[in-house]
Amino acid sequence: MGSNYIVIEGLEGAGKTTARDVVVETLEQLGIRNMIFTREPGGTQLAEKLRSLVLDIRSVGDEVITDKAEVLMFYAARVQLVETVIKPALAQGIWVIGDRHDLSTQAYQGGGRGIDQTMLATLRDAVLGDFRPDLTLYLDVTPEVGLKRARARGDLDRIEQESFDFFNRTRARYLELAAQDSRIRTIDATQPLDAVMRDIRATVTKWVQEQAA
């Protein structure tokens, strides 16, 4: 079996925290217990400070964060996490379960913000090389459903306050990218919770068994 990096992706309110719990439970049932958890942006001292800058609407006062500055902060946080936490863990045979990775940037900034996708791909390759998650679970939910759930939780960060149009563009890009990459498995997160959990368990179990074959 190769490296074991599983990432959970999706719009706000898609249910990533619940999905992570199901992934962990499924892996443990398969005898896998040596794992760590990451989130993006974040996961290291530096990356957490960058997270605060890019997501907290109060962090820069009245200054507007430009789209390109936003992208670069996401990548600065990401490469710090990958190089100092994720890669060392994978090298030791530890499983890594991530809350978001590069697919978020390709969808949110490439789709939602409309940043040139060729530029994003070039930046990704320069920063990450060929490093990719081994399995990505994309929890697909409409912005109407996802944002209703997110807003019920309380305070929204800077990106969560974007328009429905922004999230519709983001979702469209997620779906486009998922259709192009066999390592990305789409889960219908608009289903009842039991059905979503069932699909996650089945997807993870099948993938682990395929890797072990």
From Swiss-Prot:
PROSITE patterns hit by this protein: THYMIDYLATE_KINASE
Q: Return one GO MF term.
A: ATP binding
The cross-references to InterPro entries, in alphabetical order and at most eight, read: P-loop_NTPase, Thymidylate_kin-like_dom, Thymidylate_kin_CS, Thymidylate_kinase
Query: Which GO biological-process labels does this protein carry?
Result: dTDP biosynthetic process; dTTP biosynthetic process; dUDP biosynthetic process
User: What reaction gets catalysed by this protein?
Assistant: dTMP + ATP = dTDP + ADP
Asked whether the UniProt record includes Nucleotidyltransferase among its keywords, one would answer no
Q: Which GO terms describe its cellular component?
A: cytosol
Return the Pfam families for the record: Thymidylate_kin
Keyword annotations of the record: ATP-binding, Kinase, Nucleotide biosynthesis, Nucleotide-binding, Transferase
List positions binding ATP.
Answer: G10, L11, E12, G13, A14, G15, K16, T17
Q: What is its EC number?
A: 2.7.4.9
Q: What class of enzyme is it?
A: transferase
UniProt family annotation: Belongs to the thymidylate kinase family.
Q: Which HAMAP family match?
A: Thymidylate_kinase (MF_00165)
Q: Which PANTHER family match?
A: THYMIDYLATE KINASE, UMP-CMP KINASE 2, MITOCHONDRIAL
Functional description taken from the UniProt entry: Phosphorylation of dTMP to form dTDP in both de novo and salvage pathways of dTTP synthesis.
Protein name, entry field: Thymidylate kinase
* Annotated source species: Salmonella paratyphi B (strain ATCC BAA-1250 / SPB7)
